[in-house]
A protein has these predicted regions:
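C-terminal beta-signal and adjacent terminal beta-strands/loops
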Residues: 17, 630-688
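N-terminal periplasmic accessory domains that precede
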Residues: 55-58, 99-101, 125-147, 161
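Face-selective signature of the C-terminal outer-membrane beta-barrel domain
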Residues: 219-239, 266-420, 426, 434-436, ...
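Gram-negative outer-membrane beta-barrel transporters
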Residues: 504-507, 525-611
Length: 688
């Protein structure tokens, strides 16, 4: 309800701010940034009060804009984010946009462009809103660094370091960076136990779950102009490790001594590398560009669990797996302006492969024996080709229309335990209209058909030994096809005021869900039809009329979905479909004192998952924190903050059915509750 009141109050607040600005603030500062050819230009002066260290700090302060990295998919087509650098999207797929922007010093940024309508479609087809970071032609050498120390109330300290340096070498701007972090030290403590169908505990006991993770990353990038050619290159190397050890001691209701000890561990070691680049030049009135990428990754995983009666011989189940992934991508595009039309044509070829070996074994914790049927080995390869043509048409100064037609051809082959080869073709049309009846108001409508990509891991067997569940591989999977409808409106006022609202509806064919197999197992399979719908609201509300420098931001996302359950044929939501998320933060800037105060809250992740004989439900999670930031020391940004200082508690309920969910007969309920430590952090950023 408070959120609804805030949104309802927007028009009157907007009118108050537009009608009477404080005497000390000029109308020019309170006005929207200049709108030129569909672009709102944010010069460095706009961000002066924020004293940004890098381009990421600047983009993060563009009102009404959130950085989106794009989808984690194979190839370039669906992986594009909503940030461009000098009019081009970064070639790297392994790095997120914030990391890339953090390596661009703020004093090397000429301007930030917020593109909408035809301007966005011309540079990034399919995107509703795009930010373009334009660097200075005479960019200077310089570097930046960030050191952060995170602490938990139990006493564990987590350090992280990022540093990058940009230098001019001949015609190239060269940037090198390093990141290293001990980024996870969760000590989850709590209890769990089994209940009868009436919710009465039959057994329960304490649980201790400790997790540790660390990673290191090296990056190198170069770009420059050589006559008519523009060149960009990038490379990165990543290595990470994860460790988890857990133990649970269970005591029957009414007893004084435990009767069973459950324990297990999980490990993951990962190494990835990526090399990519693009070259661009004008050819006969067209701007041609070719982008190339090569990446590879290796993972080794172990999952072990045992549920052992005290005094009895120990028995454990263990699942070992290793995999190697390869991706090679080439994309060629040509674009040209024909009067009111911006036309782009192109094609893409992507090759991806997965080599996977998994072994399930049982033993006493020291010696494990695998049965022949418990060994899974497979190789999956996909060759995907895509051709497209798009037209961004400026019908009038207030109306633009973007139309795209894409054809996708793919062949997926699988060798090993279940050899198979299949080919697919999918047309993917998209139509988007943007109407701006007057400055500050934008309406948009979109219709798009997109096609998901299959997770190669679903072709191979897998296991969650901690829950005692195994999934079979399915070589017959088909990708999901979505028909999406979106309507949205945006209202801007003053220097930073923004209100965004949108509704969406999705018709899904071949929805992926866990289904029972003929042999009595469980595998990922396709549901013929499903639907999903919801709305998004977001608000940036300056409150300078109440207190100079005060600002509130908030967002709310609501989703619902339905499909016919493949087992019961009843209607239910998707697995993993959380209904809503709420996020809000408030900040108070005091530029004269070079001080900023803030607080935030996040609520969401009420998920459900379904298996043929089980249902899982997770509680809603509430996170909150606050911070103080100072730039009183020349060249440094220092921030001290806390997150969930009193800790956090969440739960999971697993309901087991006999023989499966069709019967409605509950055999037992597992209740699991975990608590985390409160955390604090100290961050120091600087330049050199």
């Amino acid at each position: 309800m408070p959120l609804a009141v805030s949104f309802a109050a927007v028009p009157s607040l907007a009118q108050a701010q537009e009608g009477s600005a404080p005497a000390a603030t000029s109308s020019k500062i309170m006005a929207l940034p200049d709108l030129i050819d569909g672009k709102r230009i944010f010069t460095p002066a706009y961000f002066t009060a924020d004293s940004p260290q890098n381009a990421a700090d600047m983009v993060g302060r563009v009102p009404g804009f959130d950085i989106e990295d794009g989808d984690n998919v194979r190839g370039f087509g669906g992986a594009a984010g909503n940030v461009l650098i000098d009019g081009a999207r970064p070639t790297s797929k392994s790095e997120n946009l914030v990391s890339i922007l953090s390596r661009i010093p703020a004093n090397n940024v000429e301007r930030i462009e917020l593109l909408q309508g035809a301007a966005a479609g011309a540079l990034a087809p399919g995107k509703t809103q795009v930010v373009n970071v334009v660097r200075k032609a005479d960019a200077k050498s310089g570097g930046s660094w960030a050191l952060q120390i995170d602490g938990v109330s139990s006493g564990f300290i987590l350090p992280s370091l990022e540093a990058s340096y940009t230098a001019r070498l001949g015609r190239l701007n060269v940037t090198a960076g390093i990141e290293t972090e001990y980024d996870d030290a969760d000590n989850l403590v709590g209890f769990e136990g089994f209940q009868d169908p009436n919710g009465v505990f039959l057994e329960r006991g304490p649980n201790d779950d400790r997790r540790r993770a660390r990673y290191g990353k090296l990056t190198l990038g170069a770009d420059g102009a050589f006559g008519a050619y523009k060149l960009s290159l990038n490379a990165n190397w990543f290595r990470g490790a994860f460790r988890r050890n857990w133990v649970h001691v269970s005591t029957r209701t009414g007893a004084t001594l435990p009767f069973r000890v459950d324990q297990g561990r999980e490990t993951n070691d990962e190494t990835n590398w990526e090399i990519g680049g693009d070259i661009e030049r004008d050819i006969a009135g067209w701007t041609g560009k070719i982008a190339l990428l090569a990446k590879s990754g290796d993972q080794a995983n172990e999952s072990l669990a045992g549920f052992n009666l005290i005094g009895a011989p120990k028995s454990f189940g263990r699942f070992l797996s290793s995999d190697m992934t390869i991706e090679r991508v080439g994309r060629l595009t040509f674009k040209r302006k024909f009067g009111a039309h911006q036309v782009e044509v192109g094609g893409e070829y992507a090759f991806n492969s997965l080599d996977f070996v998994g072994v399930f074994a049982q033993g006493n914790g020291g010696v494990f024996i695998a049965q022949p049927g418990d060994i899974s080995a497979t190789q999956v390869q996909e060759a995907r080709r895509e051709a497209f043509v798009s037209d961004s048409w400026t019908i009038s100064p207030t109306l633009t229309l973007e139309a795209t037609l894409t054809g996708e051809w793919s062949t997926i082959s699988q060798s090993g335990d279940a050899a198979k080869e299949r080919s697919f073709f999918y047309p993917k049309p998209r139509l988007k209209a943007v109407w701006k009846p007057r400055d500050g108001w934008t309406y948009r409508g979109e219709i798009e058909r997109d096609v998901g990509q299959l997770d190669f891991g679903a072709f191979a067997d897998s296991a969650s030994v901690g829950d005692g569940n195994q999934n079979s591989g399915n070589p017959e999977l088909r990708p999901e096809q979505n028909l999406n409808y979106v309507l949205g409106v945006e209202r801007r006022w003053g220097k930073r005021g923004v209100l965004n609202a949108s509704v969406r509806y999705e018709q899904i064919t071949d929805k992926l869900e866990l289904v029972p197999t003929i042999g009595g197992g469980v595998a990922l399979g396709n549901i013929p039809e499903a639907t999903k719908w919801g709305y998004n609201l977001s608000l940036t509300l300056p409150l300078d009329n109440l207190l100079q420098g005060l600002e509130v931001e908030g967002s709310y996302r609501w989703r619902d979905s339905e499909l016919n359950d493949p087992l019961t044929d009843s209607v239910r939501p998707f697995s993993g479909n959380n209904g809503n998320q709420f996020n809000a933060n408030i900040r108070y800037d005091m530029p004269a004192r070079k001080l900023r105060l803030g607080a935030w809250i996040w609520r969401g992740n009420h998920n459900r998952d379904y298996r043929p004989d089980q249902r899982f439900e997770w509680s809603t999670i509430n996170n909150w924190g606050m911070f103080v930031e100072t730039k009183a020391i020349q060249g440094l940004t220092i921030e001290l903050g806390v997150e969930n200082p009193d800790g956090n508690t969440f739960s999971r309920v697993r309901t087991d059915y006999r023989p499966d969910r069709r019967s409605g007969t509950i055999s037992r309920i597992q209740y699991r509750e975990r608590s985390t430590d409160g955390t604090w952090y100290l961050s120091v950023k600087g330049k050199f």
